[in-house]
Each structure stands twice: as C-alpha cells, then as structure tokens.
C-alpha cells in the first residue's frame, strides 16, 4: 500500500490550477447549495482540473478539526490577560484541556494551552488570528496537533 506524503507549501507558490481547486473546495464547503459546475465557473477553473486535484488539496488546518491542538502564547504580565484568552476560547466552544504558565520574565509569561477543537464554532486559523489580535497577547503559535 502506497503511503501518501504531505508537504506544507505557501499558497502563493502553487500553480493556479491547484490554488483555484482549493478555492472551489472552500466555496463548496461554505455554500453547499452550489453545484460543482457553478463553483468552478465562479472561480474560473475547468471541471477537469478541479477533479484532477480535488483529492490532493486540503487547507492546512482542515486535518486538525475535531482534534487536540497545542498553542504557545506570550502574554503580557497584566491582570486578566490569560482570563480573556480562556474566555475567548470558551466563547467559541473550544474545550481547554491543559494550561501551563511559566513565571513571567521581563513582563512576558509563556503559556501553553491544549484545546479540544471538535465543537469549536470557528476554524483553527480564525482562532489563531483572533487570539493574536487580543490586547496583551504578543505571540500565538500552533505547536502541536493530534
């Protein structure tokens, strides 16, 4: 049995047909009422190109949904910053499994949080982006998933 090998590649270096295949798949997942014909027409790719690549193109965070992810964050040493982060995760149905916070050094605390993502109401990518924009959060990084 052939084992499939995966690579993490920046989208801007991919050929147009593969990028557009990913766009069609995203469009179909967000708008299930669309047919493949309608989606490929909207994106501007042929049906044959879509069918050629569709089984080999996945968003990076797609494989992590329904799984456990581990985030590493740098938080400012101020009252309420960690609480706001945890409340935000809970607001979108992320289930916090573990929290490890180191003593603050230079006004920054390193925090590692493991989250079960199965019931989350936002994508992992959206969660990471929103957390990185929060006041008091200077770094957010996905360091593991299982």
Curated annotation (Swiss-Prot):
Intrachain S-S bonds: none
InterPro entries the record matches: ACT-like_dom_sf (IPR045865), ACT_dom (IPR002912), UPF0735_ACT_dom-cont (IPR008310)
PROSITE patterns recorded: ACT
Family, as annotated: Belongs to the UPF0735 family.
Signal peptide from the UniProt entry: none
CDD domains registered for this protein in UniProt: ACT_PheB-BS
Limits of the ACT domain: 70-145
SUPFAM superfamilies named among the record's database cross-references: ACT-like
Full protein name: UPF0735 ACT domain-containing protein CHY_1913
Organism, scientific name: Carboxydothermus hydrogenoformans (strain ATCC BAA-161 / DSM 6008 / Z-2901)
């Amino acid at each position: 049995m052939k084992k499939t090998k995966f690579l993490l590649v920046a989208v801007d270096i991919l050929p147009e047909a593969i990028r557009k295949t990913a766009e069609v798949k995203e469009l179909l997942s967000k708008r299930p009422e669309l047919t493949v014909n309608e989606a490929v027409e909207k994106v501007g790719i042929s049906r044959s190109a879509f069918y050629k690549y569709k089984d080999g193109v996945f968003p990076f965070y797609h494989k992590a949904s329904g799984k456990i992810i581990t985030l590493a964050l740098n938080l400012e040493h101020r009252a309420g910053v960690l609480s706001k982060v945890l409340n935000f995760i809970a607001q979108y149905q992320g289930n916090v499994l573990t929290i490890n916070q180191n003593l603050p050094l230079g006004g920054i605390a390193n925090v590692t949080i493991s989250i079960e993502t199965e019931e989350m109401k936002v994508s992992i990518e959206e969660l990471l982006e929103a957390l990185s924009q929060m006041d008091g959060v200077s770094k957010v990084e996905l360091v593991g998933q299982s």
